[in-house]
Amino acid sequence: MILVLDFGSQYTQLIARRLRESGIYAEIVPFFESIENIQKKAPKGLILSGGPASVYAKDAYKPSEKIFDLNVPILGICYGMQYLVDFFGGVVAGANEQEFGKAVLEITQDSVIFEGVKTKSLVWMSHMDKVIELPKGFITLAKSPNSPHCAIENGKIFGLQFHPEVIQSEEGGKILENFALLVCDCEKTWGMQHFAQREIARLKEKIANDKVLCAVSGGVDSTVVATLLYRAIKDNLIAVFVDHGLLRKNEKERVQAMFKDLQIPLNTIDAKGIFLSKLKGVSEPELKRKIIGETFIEVFEKEAKKHHLKGKIEFLAQGTLYPDVIESVSVKGPSKVIKTHHNVGGLPEWMDFKLIEPLRELFKDEARLLGKELGISQDFLMRHPFPGPGLAVRILGEVSESKIKRLQEADFIFIEELKKANLYDKVWQAFCVLLNVNSVGVMGDNRTYENAICLRAVNASDGMTASFSFLEHSFLEKVSNRITNEVSGINRVVYDITSKPPGTIEWE
């Protein structure tokens, strides 16, 4: 196992992800992790991440110096390399020319870390400081136009000024793999088949004959959690799906069919009437979210009580992922509130359940791979993200049954055409937004005054930033024609060309 010490870089999670993609298990801890906890994890190597600070600053982040007594290989990346240079007596100073973006790395000295790596390759830079003078015993392995010491080595201590974890670094994955396999002597034992077997055995032992309540949203995470649990405890799993009437077209039927195919019993609650009555007259986005969240808890509590009377429920399952765990103990300090699944936050006190989080070691892409291993269809696993409050936040203004129907039909057409054109898997997320404006139109010989709808499609890697998708005009025209002809009450279609930032992906 490789342990990554996080110094606050926006790319830290990518280090662990790249290693895991190579079959090497990696964990992330904050730079201030105690040496006792690090020793308990027994890592075969340490990676010191990048970070936004300067090593010569008064309040610079510094790990326990005892990491050097562990006698394991260490790789410093960007700030991590500068920390190593500073610690061992070298000189780091502000660079005359800062480096952000792509640069050409030129290897000048053979090293095990560059085994099988091209002599010249593109790498990703993101630094304002640079190494001016190496500590005694260190040698330079590579340079870039603005960094004479772009990679360094002293025995089993290595430093890289660039970010190998970022996809723009052409040979970055290979370099990280070399460090783990050739320097740290790790083995490729990480994968979803092994994880599934291990986790099912662990869940069987932990839960035994107790019951587990699991809220199913129809999304990837909760479906994977429910499937994993059912493999472990069979009918002691109580999977609950609340239909709040704000789902995509045919969503309830699709989820039910999926669970039937997986042979997992599903308790479906039809709560459309309750949700719509409580949303009546409400236009403000945050109030809509609040009402939906509170109503979900009310409906979920009622269903849980029914099952609780039949036999005490000991556990509540959540789809917490590894990024949520990392964020709760980031370099900024432990969060006051650990992020929870939108469907189960704020449950009443009588639900004094123990928490089960089977996916807490996994990144999102790994959760999808686990789902595939468990037999969940690829089509389902690769669906675009969908907000917890559902279509309520894609209907601007007050929500009504007729507006939901209108949006469902338009959204169905847009997604159907994306799939027909083989574009669905090429965009990160696509959906329709029903605008709270009407516009004048002409249909046949008649004047119309009906709803406008907005098409939204974005490209992204993680949703933190996004750019609008460049869809062909002919494709957009086809979608527009279908919507205005097939969906009653819509006479105008527009396309959103706003990126994030300044906009957000969702409108509300």
Curated annotation (Swiss-Prot):
Superkingdom of origin: Bacteria
Pfam family, one: NAD_synthase
Keyword ATP-binding carried by entry: yes
GO CC term, one of those recorded: cytosol
EC number of this enzyme: 6.3.5.2
Active site: C78, H163, E165
Pathway involvement of the protein, from the record: Purine metabolism; GMP biosynthesis; GMP from XMP (L-Gln route): step 1/1
Stretches assigned to the GMPS ATP-PPase domain: 190-383
UniProt domain Glutamine amidotransferase type-1: residue ranges: 1-189
Positions of disulphide bridges: none
Subunit text: Homodimer.
NCBIfam families found in the cross-reference section: guaA_Cterm, guaA_Nterm, PRK00074.1
Purpose of the protein: Catalyzes the synthesis of GMP from XMP.
Designated name of the protein: GMP synthase [glutamine-hydrolyzing]
Species whose genome carries this gene: Helicobacter pylori (strain HPAG1)
Lineage: Bacteria, Pseudomonadati, Campylobacterota, Epsilonproteobacteria, Campylobacterales
Gene encoding the protein: guaA
